[in-house]
Amino acid sequence: MAWTSTLPAHLLNLIKNSKYVHVATCSKDCIPSVALMNYIYVPGEKLFGQTDNKNDYIIFVSPQDTQKFYNIKENPKVALLFHDWIIANNLSVGKESISGTPTPTSIPHEEQRQSELLNLLQELNQAELNQMSASIGGETEIVNPESEESKYYKDLILKANPDAKAFIFEKNTAVVKVRIDNARVSNNENRTMFLSKGKS
């Protein structure tokens, strides 16, 4: 059984089912970069042509002419951010601006806030809102773009993200596999837990 089975159930569900992940990379000169990516979660037993019973993987497609890809080639260590916080547009519902810049709308302030709050409450399933985030540490492997393995993973990513077909099968892209090595989990009460293969 993969060590990731020790992760909180909600977090594991979040990793398996979210549409996007923030991918943080770093060059050999320690210059960081971050990108928002479509991805899939692949259990070790469903890897192409092999079985890994101890690890699970995050897999995404990247253009080969990006800083992110250059960084991965130079430094295979990456960090991945998953979260279920309220989306950024809705976070402003409970926050007052200190910039002094007027809001570009003719709707009265209080009425606008009530409308935003109503929309927010309509969108949220309170039973599902756990407000948890996790930074996943892992090591990458670039898959040969001409291989059957690459096609296998691209097909899986397409199945999960059909709206990204043009990007997934764009020329000069490559599949990147990230082995999940550790996780730092935080919630909205600033409680943090660290889990890794050695501590599972």
From Swiss-Prot:
Keywords: Cytoplasm, Flavoprotein, FMN, Nucleus. Its main location: cytoplasm. It comes from the Eukaryota. GO terms for cellular component: cytoplasm; nucleus. Binds 1 FMN per subunit. FMN binds at F60, K68, N125. Its cofactor is FMN. It is found in: Cytoplasm; Nucleus. The keyword Cytoplasm applies. It holds the Pfam family PNPOx_N. PANTHER family: PYRIDOXAMINE 5'-PHOSPHATE OXIDASE YLR456W HOMOLOG-RELATED. Present with 358 molecules/cell in log phase SD medium. Belongs to the pyridoxamine 5'-phosphate oxidase family. This is Pyridoxamine 5'-phosphate oxidase homolog. It comes from Saccharomyces cerevisiae (strain ATCC 204508 / S288c).
